[in-house]
UniProtKB/Swiss-Prot annotation:
Belongs to the CCM1 family. It is found in: Mitochondrion. This is Mitochondrial 15S rRNA processing factor CCM1. Involved in mitochondrial-nuclear incompatibility, a major determinant in reproductive isolation between species, through hybrid incompatibility of Ccm1 and its interacting partner 15S rRNA between yeast species. Regulates mitochondrial small subunit maturation by controlling 15S rRNA 5'-end processing. Localizes to the 5' precursor of the 15S rRNA in a position that is subsequently occupied by mS47 in the mature yeast mtSSU. Uses structure and sequence-specific RNA recognition, binding to a single-stranded region of the precursor and specifically recognizing bases -6 to -1. The exchange of Ccm1 for mS47 is coupled to the irreversible removal of precursor rRNA that is accompanied by conformational changes of the mitoribosomal proteins uS5m and mS26. PPR repeats lie at residues 310-344, 347-381. It comes from Kluyveromyces lactis (strain ATCC 8585 / CBS 2359 / DSM 70799 / NBRC 1267 / NRRL Y-1140 / WM37).
Length: 853
């Protein structure tokens, strides 16, 4: 070691005597001994119990030892912290007698050192669990001290605000609301910066309580409030999510109250209402689908506050008009936006909304105009633009009326848009980023294949879609349940079966024609897409994702269905499969508690009147429907599509079976329930004779322990998977009678609809709906008699319904041509006089004009 002399220099003697030495590094062959360092275990890993396999004894024992070690360390740390606190208190007492200047110096040094320590630790350093538990100011760091002082339950603050990713301020607001001081004395600026700006995701109740406390803090003097506070309150109320229509209307009512209170504030203070306030109000009115509130807010801000809505406001209004099906107003507002100013010029979002309006109207011409206009004005097209345009053209190709005879051309152009999405890297990226876009694309492709009658492509799409959904929901179930828990396949299938996609598949079955060539096979790119999709599906289930489930989609193991009978059978199997939650129930089985005649007797004994009996029966039916039948699939829209399949494939027996099994007459149900109640009260129960509604196979399925249930019980049980007939069902039945030339079916339908017109279900319709329904059914009756060459009967229907039906020539065109073909000029003339007759108002106007005044 070298020493320094008096002047700080090295001693020369030592330098001369020092020997030079060379340090040789160790050879690489020599292995150094590794240090034995204790592994540091993260607190999160210690407390994580979800990853433990409780069936593994060693793993469980290891976790127990780990938790014991963690508890011991935590106890020592608490003891050490308490000792430090005690020493700190003693030092503070000693420093009270020390010179104040020295105390200030120590305090400043402490501040500097603490700031240096903070810099060393870094801003991202996380506190462990023990530090948070030992901190005396944990609640004050989560909540301002002036608020935490008013909340007695300190544990509540930690429970609600400890997890920063999932904070719940609703209990905090409730606790403040029930406290003694509430928000008194805090000041508006503190309330805005520390409460309104920080407390998010509040419920309607919490926001109402907060609003009440704010008004209380200012002595109910609204003039002490400011624009920022009103804006934040309105935005918070508009973000409230309420599943009920009444809840949404309550939000609008609260916003209206705030605007009226703001009027009082504006009379004493000068601030300008903002666009955010307007958008919050009209957004809430749009969610509530309320014309009254929408009209009030628009007039309030434009007239009272002299504010011009911006493009975002107008976009919300257009969306509201679209939801309310007032498409004419949406088009008028869209056209006016083009001429207001450059700031109001429609952007991509507005154009996409108008393409959705084109979908609703099935107006392909306007869709093409909108698409071309975007090119002319250099408006950016995004993925949604192409999807909306493609779907609009697909829906417009539904029939020759909406497509104007250009159905195939519209489908071809729609497929071109879909190919554009796949070919464009930017659009493909948008497609993969948002799962919702994938759904829209798949839905558009299903619409195209359904209207085109491309059963092969539609089957492949439906199979892949349902299989993918089942897989996702299956693994989601496994993620949140143990391996020993039984898999709830009913719940999984209920989530996986889509009513909309199933309806499009049924529509493709109904459009099936063996001789028809799908549009996709008309050009190379389409053929390649169709071939790759169809051959990527294995209907035998070898590549399915159903795991341990023995149930899979009942689809024939064929890439193409080339026969109408196969189509009928597969549609019937899929229909039952969807209704039975993936085959986990049998809709023909007797429910629990209703196996014998005695079960009905017990219900009758409990009911004093026939109305009580009907009520109890209705409650039982509601329970059965919710438990045993998937009524997400069994709706009127899907049922009509299901009934249309045998009509278009010309299978009259199949249609009658489907109609009988899945529909019932409401008036007939009431009659049978009343009749059964009277017979049961007189102890004259029906003999166990099978109903005509059930064949031998059905009755065998319903036999319980060798006892055949009564006819009424069978009828009652079948109600759980039946829908009451309405105007649409009677119209479908008449179309079937026309297609099958079935006189008996036509007369039965006519008679039953006459009884239906006397029921409450028909009388509850609006006068316009009743008149439209009568006109449609009368037109179908005329068409039936015309096809059967019963021309006088057809003419009689027209003449007898002059008061209720406004007959147009397009409605009787086939009858007029038939009358001319048989040279019945008198009947043809009478028919023309009916369709050419003028209303009384028009006749009166013409008479006034003809007067020579």
């Amino acid at each position: 070691m070298l020493s320094l002399g008096k002047n700080g220099k090295t001693s020369s003697t030592l330098v001369r005597n020092a020997r030079r030495s060379v340090i040789m590094p160790a050879s690489r062959d020599v292995r150094s001994r590794k240090r034995r360092a204790r592994s540091v275990t993260d607190t999160k890993d210690v407390l994580d119990l979800d990853s433990i396999d409780f069936t593994n004894e060693k793993e469980v024992q290891f976790k127990v030892n780990q938790l014991k070690e963690f508890t011991r360390n935590l106890r020592e740390q608490i003891k050490y912290t308490d000792e430090l606190k005690r020493k700190h208190v003693i030092e503070e007492e000693e420093t009270k007698s020390v010179d104040p200047e020295m105390h200030d110096f120590d305090s400043d040094a402490g501040v500097i050192l603490s700031s240096l320590n903070d810099k060393v630790a870094g801003p991202g350093a996380e506190q462990n669990l023990s530090t948070l538990l030992l901190s005396d100011k944990a609640d004050t760091s989560l909540l301002p001290e002036r608020l935490s002082e008013r909340i007695k339950d300190k544990d509540l603050i930690l429970r609600c605000l400890f997890d920063k990713r999932n904070r719940d301020f609703n209990p905090i607001v409730t606790e403040l609301y029930h406290s003694e001081q509430r928000l008194k004395g805090l000041g508006i600026q503190f309330i805005y910066s520390k409460i309104l700006s920080k407390f998010d995701k509040l419920s309607f109740t919490s926001l109402s309580q907060l609003d009440e406390m704010i008004m209380e803090s200012v002595g109910n003097d609204s003039s002490r409030l400011n624009g920022n506070l009103y804006e934040h309150l309105m935005l918070s109320f508009s973000r409230v999510t309420s599943p009920s229509a009444q809840g949404k209307l309550e939000v609008c009512g609260k916003l209206r109250e705030l605007t009226e209170r703001m009027d009082a504030t504006l009379s004493k203070k000068s601030f300008q209402p903002t666009q955010y306030m307007l958008n919050a109000c009209i957004f809430a009115a749009s969610k509530a689908m309320s014309w009254e509130y929408m009209d009030f807010f628009l007039k309030k801000f434009t007239s009272t506050y002299d504010m011009q809505p911006n493009r975002k406001n107008y976009t919300t209004v257009i969306s509201f008009y679209t939801k309310m099906e007032h498409y004419k107003k949406a088009w008028q507002l869209f056209d006016s936006l083009k001429f207001l100013s450059l700031e109001h010029k429609p952007d991509t979002k507005v154009y996409n909304l108008m393409l959705e309006v084109c979908q609703k109207e099935k107006n392909y011409a306007r869709s093409l105009d909108i698409f071309q206009e975007m090119d002319d004005l250099n408006v950016t097209k995004d993925l949604k633009t192409y999807l909306n345009a493609a779907k609009s053209l697909a829906l417009s190709s539904a029939d020759n009326v909406t497509s104007e005879g250009k159905a195939d051309s519209l489908r071809l152009m729609s497929w071109k848009y879909i190919h554009k999405i796949h070919d464009d890297p930017k659009l493909s990226k948008q497609l993969t980023e948002n799962p919702r876009n994938n759904m829209l694309l798949l839905e558009t492709m299903m619409v195209l294949s359904a209207y085109d009658g491309d059963v092969g492509f539609a089957r492949a799409l439906y199979y892949k879609y349902t299989n993918a959904l089942f897989k996702a929901h299956f693994y989601e179930f496994k993620k949140y349940h143990k391996d020993t828990d039984p898999v709830d396949y009913i719940r999984i299938w209920k989530k996986s079966l889509s009513a909309q996609m199933f309806n499009w598949l049924m529509l493709s079955y109904s459009k099936f024609k063996k001789s028809r060539l799908p549009v996709l096979l008309g050009y190379p790119e389409g053929s390649s897409l169709r071939r790759s999709m169809i051959y990527s599906v294995d209907y035998s289930g070898r590549d399915s994702s159903y795991e341990n489930s023995n149930i899979q989609l009942p689809m024939l193991p064929m890439t193409e269905l080339n026969d109408a009978e196969l189509t009928i059978n597969e549609s019937k199997a899929l229909w039952r499969f969807n209704l039975e939650f993936g085959g986990n129930y049998d809709i023909r089985e007797l429910p629990e508690g209703m196996q014998t005649v005695k079960d009905i007797e017990n219900i009758v004994k409990c009911a004093k009147t026939v109305n009580e009996f009907k009520l109890q029966i209705s409650q039982r039916l509601l329970e059965w429907k919710n438990r045993y039948v998937n009524h997400k699939i069994l709706n009127m829209k899907s049922l009509i599509t299901f009934l249309t399949i045998p009509i278009r494939l010309h299978e009259p027996n199949e249609f009658k079976l489907r109609l009988q099994e899945f529909t019932f007459q409401a008036f007939e149900f009431n009659e049978r329930v009343e009749y059964q109640f009277k017979k049961s009260k007189t102890n004259e129960l029906e003999s166990p004779v099978l109903s005509k509604d059930f064949n031998t196979t059905d009755s065998n399925a319903l036999v319980d322990n060798g006892i055949i249930p009564s006819e009424f019980l069978l009828y009652l049980v079948s109600m759980k998977h039946k829908l009451a007939t309405n105007c649409a069902i009677y119209e479908v039945s008449m179309k079937a009678a026309i297609a099958f030339h079935d006189y008996e079916l036509a007369m039965t339908t006519w008679k039953n609809r006459g009884k239906f017109r006397m029921t409450d279900a028909f009388q509850k319709l609006t006068p316009g709906e009743r008149q439209q329904s009568d006109a449609t059914f009368a037109q179908l009756m005329v068409e039936y008699f015309t096809n059967e060459k019963m021309y006088q009967d057809a003419l009689s229907i027209i003449l007898s319904s002059l008061k209720t039906v406004n007959w147009q020539y397009s409605m009787v065109k086939s009858l007029h041509r038939a009358l001319l073909a048989i040279e019945d000029e008198n009947s043809a003339a009478r028919l023309l006089s009916v369709v050419n007759r003028k209303s009384k108002i028009v006749e009166l106007e013409e008479e006034i004009k003809s007067l020579d005044l």
